[in-house]
Amino acid sequence: MDRMFGTDGVRGIANTELTAQMAYNLGRAGAYVLTEGAHKPKILVAKDTRISGDMLESALVAGILSVGAEAVILGVVPTPAVAYLTREYNADAGVMISASHNPVEYNGIKFFNNKGYKLSDELEDGIQKVIESDFEGVPSPIGIDLGRERIEVAALEDYTEFAKQTIPYNLKGMKIALDCANGASYKSAVKAFRDLGADVFVINDNPDGTNINKNCGSTHPEELMDYVVKKGCDLGFAFDGDADRCLAVDENGKLINGDFILMLCANYLKEIGKLKDDTLVVTVMSNLGLDIACRGLGIKLEKTKVGDRYVLEEMTKDNYVLGGEQSGHVIFLDYNTTGDGLVTALQVASIVKKKEKTLSELCSVMKELPQVLVNATVPNDKKNIYLEDAEIVEAIKEIEAKLNGVGRVLIRPSGTEPLVRVMLEGENQVEIDEMAHGLANLILSKI
């Protein structure tokens, strides 16, 4: 069997690829592997606003209960809430049902260990082995030894209070726009900013089960960019479906991506002496402009493979406090063990208030190099063709020669979708756009 787990849990089209049976199996195997030896283990379960969440939650919980574990239902909360509450509630594990920024037909299941960290490859493989063995050796308790489920009504409030306490003062006098992507942040983000005294304007906070990420949120920020200007806001924030990431919008309606957010937060933490070893952890997808800006600010960069799990691994290895991705996954390890959109938004807003400058002014120390990202739809079993085909390899070499050291080519298979991502950076936008599309078309022609 192919590996079930991708870079962010198990993901697929709900009810065909990610079926109720698979959710049951994951619940049963996950509860067994993650809580072995624990007496009446406790596992938290949450979901985003997708229509398929109810079906998958029911099946997943049935699997958890079938091995005698307790399932604590958190309801609709952001992914980072699961990471935080797993620690806060002394649970043995946490599970989030979400496909993050993907369209509504997708869903996913990702596990957190008892410390709120995403699982290692070894633990994920262990869960898969239990399923493939047809649950050999896994107990099937009866009677009073079966598990029970209970609903934790305070989950959303507890997470929101935690997020608010990550900034040292209120946001009174600030006008802030939020795009909740009709997803998991639609209550917590609005409440947190309002409780802190901001004047809050909200769009896409009315989920109906089918409109999550639909032309909104961090993958479609255009509406928010217009809205910030229209309402005269100081800044805006766009979350994705499960609110583990966010992007910002400045007072002029310009999108501020994760690279800028990381630079801004790293610079502030360095100024107040809280950036461990003056080091920021990013991925190979970060813009070269971030390298240049950080060099000028005296900030060192550590680079990892793409995926917030790899950023987190590097951070925990050397106790770095800040890391993230251009996509808006930002990890403040002093506060949470995963990307946290609400915590990120609160940090940015508090820095803008503290510095008494506009977001555009604070971001002006960094200049982005033109960057183009083209997705080529490629079946999962052909994703490595760019490594093996001589014509593609030669085309990459030719592009690198033309860029002449000022830019780069990066090709990366998606860990969650049947895509190969072709990314180019260089000084000339038109030139790299043409090169990126040409290379993507060449990859497609080889399928």
Swiss-Prot record:
Post-translation changes: Activated by phosphorylation.
GO cellular component, one term: cytosol
Cofactor(s) listed: Mg(2+)
UniProt cofactor note: Binds 1 Mg(2+) ion per subunit.
SUPFAM superfamilies xrefs: Phosphoglucomutase, C-terminal domain, Phosphoglucomutase, first 3 domains
EC number, as in UniProt: 5.4.2.10
GO terms assigned for molecular function: magnesium ion binding; phosphoglucosamine mutase activity; phosphomannomutase activity
Record HAMAP family: GlmM_B (MF_01554_B)
Full protein name: Phosphoglucosamine mutase
Source species of the chain: Clostridium botulinum (strain Alaska E43 / Type E3)
Upper lineage: Bacteria, Bacillati, Bacillota, Clostridia, Eubacteriales
Gene that produces this protein: glmM
